[in-house]
């Protein structure tokens, strides 16, 4: 079973902090690299995948735990479900909203829709929002419309949304997306926002942000796949992502860091909703910028102020390290970490923008990224190494 461990940092300059297990119930507690802390820092939200079977499709509940007491609370569970290799609905990948006591997460097809929609799958899921007070009060964020004989309902999507991430001001929600009507198109990204013209049954109007081309058909510079996305800044005016793009030789591919500019006043209703033969396209005024031509990977992370983006890349010594680049692309990327064993995962900014956190060699580390003499200085906040107990906490 997966348990949650909280790290208490007594002093950022100390070589180690205190780890404390906070969950003990006999089920999995999965964070999924999302925005799991409540706005007041009291709770962590999680799903329970892998308890009854593999994957989100077998997760039966969305829950939270109070960090100080370890008390767990159920936030949402489907009324009925089926588990196994063909499962539904499946709920998971939960994130808190920074501006209210709500969480958003993936919700697969309700059982009464399985005959029409099929079982849980990547292109067969919606976003749901639940009030995190234990009342179970919930709304559907988006509407799914897969009718192939007409254009898609404006503001709806035709597949599955995933990894729902609120902006820090709570106004927009970003997501990754898989299309069911045109499966020859790879994963891409989009966003949604509350709108009076949201389709019936949903609170938000949906649009894609990156118009990918069908797999294995890209011309040099065209994007076939977009993922690893996160907001840059508080207001959702930029969304950074990793794009798989055809190289200039017309044969090979590159994975590079991109940014989508989403103006504050963009009219989301100018987006094309798509049809059985055309993928949806972004609203007017959205612009895509390529920031790197060297390899980039992972889930990228932007500062709250929106001035810098952190991502993973391969250093000169062949290890995976954290690099930083200005969000406007005005300066070249800078290598921020120099871990002998490279970086594993868990990349996050401190709210100040002066420190990055990540996992290396099964330990949690903090790296100073404030410009100046201390840039790149790193301290491990936990023990590290290859011992069984470290693997258990990784």
Say what each PLM segment does.
Residues 15-394:
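Sequence signature of WD/YWTD-type beta-propeller architectures
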Residues 1-10:
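Bacterial N-terminal signal peptides
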């Amino acid at each position: 079973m997966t348990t949650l461990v909280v790290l208490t940092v007594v002093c950022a300059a100390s070589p180690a902090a205190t780890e404390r297990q906070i969950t003990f119930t006999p089920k999995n507690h999965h964070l999924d690299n999302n925005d799991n802390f409540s706005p007041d820092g009291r709770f962590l939200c999680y799903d329970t995948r892998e308890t009854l079977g593999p994957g989100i499709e077998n997760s039966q509940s969305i829950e939270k735990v109070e960090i100080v007491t370890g008390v767990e609370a159920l936030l949402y569970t489907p009324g009925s479900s089926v588990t196994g290799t063909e499962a539904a609905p499946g709920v998971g990948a939960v994130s808190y909203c920074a501006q209210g006591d709500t969480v958003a997460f993936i919700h697969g097809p309700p059982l009464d829709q399985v005959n029409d929609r099929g079982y849980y799958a990547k292109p067969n899921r919606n976003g749901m929002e639940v009030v995190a007070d234990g009342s179970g009060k919930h709304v559907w964020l988006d509407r799914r419309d897969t009718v192939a004989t007409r254009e898609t309902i404006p503001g709806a999507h035709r597949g599955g949304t995933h990894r729902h991430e609120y902006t820090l001001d709570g106004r927009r929600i970003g997501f990754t997306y898989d299309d069911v009507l045109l499966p020859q198109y790879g994963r891409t990204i989009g966003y949604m926002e509350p709108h009076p013209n949201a389709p019936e049954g949903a609170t938000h109007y949906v649009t894609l942000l990156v118009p990918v081309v069908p797999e294995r058909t890209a011309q040099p510079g065209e994007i076939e796949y977009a993922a690893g996305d996160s907001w840059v800044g508080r207001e959702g005016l930029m969304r950074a992502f990793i794009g798989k793009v055809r190289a200039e030789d017309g044969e090979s591919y590159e994975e590079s860091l991109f940014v989508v500019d989403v103006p504050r006043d963009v009219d989301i209703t100018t987006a094309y909703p798509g049809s059985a033969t055309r993928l949806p396209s972004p609203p007017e005024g959205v612009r895509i910028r390529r920031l790197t031509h060297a390899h980039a990977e992972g889930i990228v992370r932007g500062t709250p102020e929106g001035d810098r983006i952190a991502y993973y890349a391969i250093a000169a010594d062949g290890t995976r390290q954290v690099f930083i680049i200005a969000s406007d692309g005005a300066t070249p990327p800078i290598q921020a970490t120099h871990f002998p064993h490279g970086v594993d995962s868990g990349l996050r900014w401190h709210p100040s923008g002066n420190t990055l956190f990540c996992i290396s060699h099964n330990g949690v580390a903090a790296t100073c990224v404030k410009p100046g003499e201390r840039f790149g200085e790193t301290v491990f906040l936990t023990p590290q190494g290859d011992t069984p107990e470290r693997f258990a906490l990784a």
